């Protein structure tokens, strides 16, 4: 897929083949999306030497809102590559058309071969589901953190 960065340049998922990509679908109006960003950035910074990159793809939002938000906040999130889906709120959006996203935040962890290794739906402060997802993509994650991610997921599953 292709989205565009703040400067309007195309950003392709295929450009990151060989890396583990956290494809993070978010919007400027989504409170849980914004709440998840500090943790996602910390995780990206911690694992970037292992080839982890975060593509923060703004979806269901206007280009103007995206540009305003990124200009005001990008320094807080140096380990994000922020992009915008030109289809904005249409059914042709990358998030809906290619990934079936019907709620945000959603993070797809894509392995080095370009295959989806794991999915994290939503965000609750203190959870380590993203780290567990990275482990499924072949990233070396502390076994204690992986065990905690499994506990976090079981707690979520129990409340469904």
Q: Which residue ranges define each predicted feature?
A:
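Thiol-based oxidoreductase modules, predominantly thioredoxin-like and allied folds used
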Residues: 49-65, 77-90
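Active-site acidic short loop of glycosyltransferases
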Residues: 16-19, 49, 77, 101
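Alpha/beta-hydrolase fold active-site loops
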Residues: 20-21, 52, 105
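Conserved redox-active cysteine motifs that mediate thiol-disulfide chemistry
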Residues: 17, 25-45
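Thiol-/selenol-based redox modules, centered on thioredoxin-like
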Residues: 106-160
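N-terminal "domain-start" segment that seeds a small globular fold
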Residues: 1-14, 79-84, 89, 129
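Short, internal strand/loop/helix patches
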Residues: 70-113
């Amino acid at each position: 897929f292709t989205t565009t960065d703040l400067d309007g340049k195309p950003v392709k998922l295929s450009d990151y083949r060989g890396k583990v990509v956290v494809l993070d679908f978010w919007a400027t109006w989504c409170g849980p999306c914004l709440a998840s960003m500090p943790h996602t950035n910390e995780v990206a910074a911690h694992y970037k030497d292992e080839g982890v990159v975060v593509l923060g793809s703004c979806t269901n939002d206007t280009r103007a809102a995206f540009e305003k938000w990124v200009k005001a906040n990008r320094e807080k999130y140096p380990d994000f590559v922020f992009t915008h889906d030109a289809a904005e709120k249409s059914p042709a959006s990358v998030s809906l058309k290619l990934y079936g996203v019907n709620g945000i935040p959603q993070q797809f962890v894509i392995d080095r071969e370009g295959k989806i290794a794991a999915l994290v739906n939503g965000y609750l402060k203190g959870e380590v589901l993203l780290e567990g997802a990275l482990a499924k993509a072949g990233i070396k994650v502390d076994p204690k953190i992986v065990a905690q991610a499994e506990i976090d997921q079981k707690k979520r599953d129990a409340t469904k």
